[in-house]
Amino acid sequence: MDLPAYKKTFLNLKEKYQHQIQLFYGLELGLQPHLAKELPLLAASDSFDFLIGSAHIIDRLDPYCPEYFQGRSEQESYLRYFQVLLENLKTFSCFDTCGHIDYVVRYGPAKNKNYSYQAYREILDEILKVLIEKGIGLECNTAGFKYGLGHPNPTEEILLRYHELGGEILTLGSDGHAPKHLAYDFEKAGNL
């Protein structure tokens, strides 16, 4: 990523639209264990308003790619994702909120058909407790609706469990990588 070019574009847009919308400067950090030194330096390299930490790459594969699920069951694939996410959360503290903690479910062979909080309760509770202990928020990402899951990432059950465990920082995101997906189905999240 060309951070200086990104910042220049951001500042130009912030000035251009200052009377129409309030813009904040931030990044989504792709959490990976081998970046334990680099990501905190990147996070501290500029005056970001907000940073999201997310797991996308697990054992050198993105669950977006069907290859991630080859050679193991869907349950094993989901569990491995959560194990690596937990490892990342124990390693990193340089971000404000954790993005789409069950991202893997979007791309599973059966998506969320065989997925539930109860099936992964132990590790999901560990993940939520680490977030709470570190004062890191949990993102409610509405892209799950876009991908046909019928719920955000994470599910309402996980959002409620986060609150039960003492979690207080909840952020709202949509994986708006295209203008038409900005604030996608936010009205559904308001009902949670």
Model-derived regions, located:
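Short, flexible active-site loops
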Residues: 65-70, 102-115, 141
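Hydrophobic, aromatic-enriched interface-forming segments
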Residues: 74-112
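Hydrophobic faces of well-ordered beta-strands that scaffold small-molecule active sites
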Residues: 23-27, 51-53, 97-99, 138-140, ...
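Acidic (Asp/Glu)-rich catalytic clusters
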Residues: 7-19, 39-52, 89-93, 126-135, ...
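Active-site beta-loop-alpha junctions enriched in small/polar residues
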Residues: 26-32, 56-58, 102-106, 141-145, ...
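Charged catalytic cores and adjacent phosphate/nucleic-acid-binding surfaces used
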Residues: 59, 111-192
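A metal-dependent hydrolase metal-coordination microenvironment
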Residues: 1-62, 66-79, 83, 181
